[in-house]
């Protein structure tokens, strides 16, 4: 059973339905053989029904494209959730991925632009196609773009990350963590791109945040500079000292020795 819940009866289950007195329980019937029925099912609140709709759409292939495009356009203002579902289903069809991504990225709705980023990641498209979003006005879109850079092999990834990093305001902890996740296992290239972009002028509230979260070979020396700086208060020093615990290698040892001098 589930630990702590005292679940002992594993042979039976109970489903409770709360409804007004006299209401009738009706299960909608969908026709998954044609675009109209598929889209009606795609709009269902039931995950199982939406799954069947998605599978039917994929089976229909190119025949489903016109209806999906129309459905997405009709729901752009009326119901963005349905627009997102349609764009995702469209993007998973053969030869439709890149165009579906671009349609999503051009939306005025930041949530739909996020869908575009996630679809691009799902389709393993080059992040270079998302570069324009590095200056997006919505921080949630930029956070999603940062996440999409995680383990990216694109030659454009470090520059995109650096652009995103320069827009950290030193207040958005979630933005900072998105940068950290996005730079995983590629900190050396990403941090170097950031330092070059700011021309070495990294010692700001936001810049210190980025150094604190980073795991590059340069990080220990930068942390040592922060810790020993006259502008760093005694109350702030422990934070940067603890950050060194997450690092390893000879650079870490050299930084500790520099701090103790």
Residues covered by each model-derived region:
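Long, ordered, helix-rich scaffold segments
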Residues: 6-14, 18-261
């Amino acid at each position: 059973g589930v630990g702590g819940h005292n679940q002992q009866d594993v042979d039976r289950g109970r489903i409770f339905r709360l409804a007004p007195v006299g209401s009738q329980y009706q299960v909608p019937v969908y026709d998954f053989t044609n675009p109209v029925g598929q889209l009606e099912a795609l709009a269902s609140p039931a995950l199982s029904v939406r799954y069947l709709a998605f599978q039917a759409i994929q089976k229909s292939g190119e025949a489903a494209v016109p209806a999906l495009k129309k459905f997405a356009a009709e729901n752009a203002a009326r119901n963005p959730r349905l627009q997102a579902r349609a764009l995702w289903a469209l993007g998973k069809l053969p030869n439709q991925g890149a165009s579906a991504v671009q349609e999503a990225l051009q939306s005025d709705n930041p949530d739909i632009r996020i869908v575009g980023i996630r679809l691009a990641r799902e389709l393993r498209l080059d992040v270079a196609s998302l570069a324009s979003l590095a200056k997006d006005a919505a921080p949630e879109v930029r956070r999603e773009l940062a996440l999409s850079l995680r383990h990216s092999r694109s030659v454009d990834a470090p520059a995109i990350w650096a652009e995103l990093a320069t827009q950290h305001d030193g207040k958005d902890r979630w933005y900072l963590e998105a940068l950290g996740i996005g730079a995983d296992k590629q900190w050396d290239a990403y941090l170097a791109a950031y330092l070059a972009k700011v021309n070495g002028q990294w010692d700001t509230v936001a810049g210190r945040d980025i150094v604190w979260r980073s795991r590059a070979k340069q990080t220990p020396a930068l942390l040592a500079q922060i810790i020993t700086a006259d502008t760093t208060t005694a109350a702030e020093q422990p934070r940067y000292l603890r950050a060194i615990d997450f690092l390893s290698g000879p650079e870490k040892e050299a930084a500790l020795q520099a701090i103790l001098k």
